[in-house]
Amino acid sequence: MSTLVKQSLKELACLEDLQNAIGRYAHQMGYSAQVIQTGFRMMFSHWNDAEFHGFIQNEIPELDARYFESFFDIGLSFEKRRSILPCACSERIFLVSASTVPSAAFQDVLLTLLLPVHLIHRPSHSQSGFFQSVHTWLSLKAPRLAERWELIEPTYEDLYLSKIISSCDALNISASQKTIEHFRTLRDGLPIEKRPKKWIEHGHKVSAIILFKDDFDALTDADFDAIAWDASIWDQTGCLSPKSIYMECSQQEAEQFAHQLIAAFDRVAEQLPEIMPDTASLAKRNSALIMAEIEGCRMMHANRNHDCIIIHPEGGFPILLPRILNLFPVRDATHELVTRTAHGQALGTKKLLSESEKNLFSQAGYHVFCGLGQMQNPPLTWFHDNIGTLRPYLMCNA
């Protein structure tokens, strides 16, 4: 591709421009500034020509290659955007962002604005101030994008939300199942002709790591650091963060593994410090750990952050809370992973999986397969939840 892309969307991949907003709102978003900066830096590393090209081929394969450069031009007019699109798309989109991983919401906003749409964005309470600051910044950097991005207050006021839902022809929500169900109720309370034609949901998913016997026996210090990194980015929140490790080993070997991993967590903590969890979160965490101990789990705690490793006995269930990594020493990791996971997302491995193995794990929902240390670093070409980022709004096959 030509250098036009580098002068357009990639021009916004500037962490320095976001430093003020990150520093001011990091604590409100629930992360340390170092964690947020690292997450954005990893995301921006994928804003390059090759991945832009792959992104368009995945999301809008019908787009004429002659228009690839124009598509990423942040100064392109609304009318021109509409003229180069190969088919119709939603015109008013209501985007409801999750309360975790602000870089993901940031990227969703900017990529969606590359379509000829008006975007109504409801960030979470914790990220509202940050995105207000980002909107001000974008108004200076890319006014033609910012003028089509409308931020609203993160309210749960039903009448207000119903009015917005009825005014849009697409709604995209990333949230807990409870919040998703609330928005469904609001939609179902509207006359059929007032309901959005496109309804996209991204509910909670669970990611994991699998270590086969040969992989377990060949682990290096670099592998332990990579696992700790995967579980520390974004404080182990977000759908790509590993919550459990299924590994083919004995309980005794699992304890030795945990000792080595705790040391890795302490090393990674220098780069990815956490902020002190609030009182309610600590109380919930402590209650869960007490119950796990009663159920026969072994635990090890890091010295720096609140990282905790839990070694489960046979038949145990993972604790899905931040900074808790569940270990399951088993005989057949494949069987345990497939039978115990309902909503898988990313699967980290030491070795590359075969296509037949990927097909098997996809039965449990896993569709992101990557090496250790790369779980929270998806390429721009990742087809989010097997749904996509722009594809759901298009009517090319309608």
Task: Give the location of each predicted region.
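Short acidic, S/G/P-rich loop/turn micro-motifs used as interaction or catalytic elements
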Residues: 61-62, 66-68, 73-75, 177-180, ...
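Conserved small-residue-rich beta-alpha loop and adjacent elements
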Residues: 63-141
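Short, well-ordered alpha-helical microsegments
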Residues: 105, 161, 179-181, 354-357
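Short catalytic-loop micro-motif centered on adjacent basic/acidic residues
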Residues: 120-122, 170-173, 347-348
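Hydrophobic packing residues within well-ordered alpha-helices of enzyme cores
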Residues: 131-134, 183, 211, 257, ...
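Conserved NAD(P)+-binding/catalytic subdomain of aldehyde/semialdehyde dehydrogenases
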Residues: 142-251, 376, 382-398
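NAD(P)-dependent aldehyde/semialdehyde dehydrogenase
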Residues: 225, 233-398
